[in-house]
Amino acid sequence: MGKYFGTDGFRGEANKTLTVEHAYKVGRFLGWYYGKDHKAKVAIGKDTRRSSYMFEYSLVAGLTASGADVYLLHVTPTPSVSYVVRSEGFDCGIMISASHNPFQDNGIKVINGGGYKLENEVEKLIEDYIDGEIPEIPFAFGENIGKTVDYSMGRHRYIGHLISLATRSFKGIKVGLDLANGSATTVAKGVFDALGAKTYVIHGEPDGVNINSDCGSTHIEQLQKFVVEQGLDIGFAYDGDADRCLAVDELGQVIDGDAILYLCGCYMKERGELRNNTVVTTIMSNLGLYKSLDAKEIGYAKTAVGDKYVFENMMEHGHSIGGEQSGHIIFNKHATTGDGVLTSLKIMEVMLEKKEKISVLLRELKIYPQLLLNIPVVDKKMAKNDPDVMEAAKAVELELGDEGRILVRESGTESVIRVMVEAGSNEVCQKYADNVVVVLRQKGHIKA
């Protein structure tokens, strides 16, 4: 990770650690960098946070001042920006969002011309420019100043693309959607309605501050209750920028990213679509997923946490599906990043083609009890690398053996240490997680 850019772009609290000056300089640099030998063409999307508009204006000012033409997709999912960039010849795209974080935060994700997340070396150049380590970039003058275009059409093309990927009509299927008061509000219902589903929506009225607030994929209990109360066949919950999806079956049971990888991986293998007979996961995936994939004779790869790393592995080895437990799922044939609505459509495809309820299709997946603690710390690197913390984690690992595991890692987006334990029961998970938390507290790492 760099000084400003983490695993998922430049993220921070609006007007504190991420400012309009930062956004302006990002725009200035990108307009110059991509416009050295031609007039750069940049697409911008945003989520529903109040500050997203502020950052949009700053980015536009910086980009156009450097001579780039800017095309505004307005409120739209992150994957739609990737789709528009790669399918319509843009030099790069920018998504203004802090994903699943609360409304006070925001972020700037840059997507290169191939629709992929920006290369680390270019992120480093942007950081150097922000810090004044690169000479001042020249301004454009006269007719060379960039123009700004309303490009809602790009989002509508993305919606049409999603609809075209469905293999069957959804007619008669009752689907619940938790839109997290975020980017999915401009896309998801329209897609499901067009495919014939009976669509029921919650949290679809953004007001600038209610994004992710007790809703969406980080508060899946809301959708669980809704699906059961309304007697729905299935439900889908998205995060603020709709690049991740979790599902709920007809019984109200949560289908997380691991379950989605298992469901779709098995289905793709049956159809001869699982390249290299491999599913790409991250180190946070449940031990039960690996044992269940073993039982189906499906291989797997493990990467660092972040869909960026999942996609890099998929590209390097030619794998066709990968993702994270949190619901970032990448279908390499159709997308270059996690896409929540696309993931929903793929789950629907499995359910309709197999003619079974999702609860039935997942009955052979055995997930270990898992506890994940997010511990706010003073300095996440110092906490993670503290010898006593490492020793406590090692002791737990030895005691669990093959019957569980522990993972202690620093968050890529927050000042947090994540302690994850999997074991045979919730009580055992809590016991071993507490062993590490006690050491973190004793050593003064935990924020007061």
Swiss-Prot record:
Catalytic site positions: S99
Gene: glmM
Known cofactor(s): Mg(2+)
GO BP terms: carbohydrate metabolic process; peptidoglycan biosynthetic process; UDP-N-acetylglucosamine biosynthetic process
Keyword Isomerase in record: yes
Task performed by this protein: Catalyzes the conversion of glucosamine-6-phosphate to glucosamine-1-phosphate.
Keyword annotations from UniProtKB, A to Z: Isomerase, Magnesium, Metal-binding, Phosphoprotein
InterPro entries: A-D-PHexomutase_a/b/a-I (IPR005844), A-D-PHexomutase_a/b/a-I/II/III (IPR016055), A-D-PHexomutase_a/b/a-II (IPR005845), A-D-PHexomutase_a/b/a-III (IPR005846), A-D-PHexomutase_C (IPR005843), A-D-PHexomutase_C_sf (IPR036900), A-D-PHexomutase_CS (IPR016066), Alpha-D-phosphohexomutase_SF (IPR005841)
Name of the protein this chain belongs to: Phosphoglucosamine mutase
Principal EC category: isomerase
Residues modified as Phosphoserine: S99
Cofactor note: Binds 1 Mg(2+) ion per subunit.
Organism phylogeny: Bacteria, Bacillati, Bacillota, Clostridia, Lachnospirales
Posttranslational modification: Activated by phosphorylation.
Source organism superkingdom: Bacteria
Binding site for Mg(2+): S99, D239, D241, D243
Cellular component aspect of the GO annotation: cytosol
Molecular function terms, GO-annotated: magnesium ion binding; phosphoglucosamine mutase activity; phosphomannomutase activity
EC number: 5.4.2.10
PROSITE patterns documented for this protein: PGM_PMM
Catalytic activity entry: alpha-D-glucosamine 1-phosphate = D-glucosamine 6-phosphate
Family membership noted in the UniProt record: Belongs to the phosphohexose mutase family.
Membrane-crossing segments per the record: none
One family name in Pfam for this protein: PGM_PMM_III
